[in-house]
Amino acid sequence: EITGKAVLHSVVQTEPIGPKKMCDLLVIAPCTGNTLAKLSLGITDTAVTMAAKSHLRILRPVLLCVATNDALGASAQNIGRLLNTKNIYFVPLKQDDCIKKPNSLVADFDKLEDCVTLALQGKQHQPIFL
């Protein structure tokens, strides 16, 4: 309803995002540990991962808003790979509950608007880790 456009919810529907230059910036919010893994390994079996691949194919920015309970565990290597991937940007991350969920990280969603502006300029918001 916000955009007045239909939701793209299949791999087939999202594949043209890049070639048709359907958006200037792709924001994945929230970006789960599963999505992080698939993006870092180039797996495109969901609408979200295909949208990202298609958008990156034409060298446009993708902004990730991570929210995962295993960011400092199994997902850490995927975050590391993606930090080193051209045109992928992160909303700054912080531990949301270091006592009860010591491996959990979540994006600071209050910084999303600033991160959008920076990603469109080809810049990563700093610091990445809060």
Q: What residue spans do the PLM features occupy?
A:
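A cross-family phosphate/adenosyl-ligand binding-site feature
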Residues: 1-62, 67-130
